[in-house]
Amino acid sequence: DAVEVHAGHGDLISQFLSPYTNHRKDEFGGSLENRMRFMRMAMAEVMAAAGDDMAVLVKMNTRDGFRGGMEVPECIEVAKALEEIGVHALILSGGFVSRAPMYVMRGAMPIRSLTYYMQQFWLPIGVRIAGHMMIPTVPFKEAYFFEDALKFREAVKLPLVYVGGLVSREKIDMVLDAGFDGVSMARALLNEPDFVNRMAREENARNACEHANYCIAR
């Protein structure tokens, strides 16, 4: 029924968009308009292939989450460009996996679990020693992208899906009441797959996910 194109988190489209990774001197680098060129070309192909039979959603950053990356004003311009292209909805996230991974997820990364599948004998040792410096903790708070996402709600008219730290019906209602058209959850549903049904029954439903990130590390 739908396809989601990932244009955030340091994936390929995000690497073209971000001045942190895009150092090109040709028509694909430099100004924001040039850095958006690859995205426009890719999305034109996606929209043509989807036709009238499939919804096209794009996950994108509200900001990269570190100095030298994209900030909210530039990301809003990206959102406006995607609206102009005709995508059907945006999923608003943030962070850059290779540079600011915990800005995406928040909380601490359980380093010992992260090394579980590393086969070279020396690699787990090094990661366990320096892991917390390599992947610094970013404090978790519920609905942690909400303030930035509100600025996008004011700037564009297309449907917006909020993602980021939703673990209670109270906060989900807050997001929907603010004009967002949907929400996305991951860790909360890994912790409790039936959580959406429980929220329908319980006004004060809250998920027990502690955002310990063991599901990410393993």
Regions found by a protein language model. Give the residues of each.
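Flavin-dependent oxidoreductase catalytic cores
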Residues: D1-R218
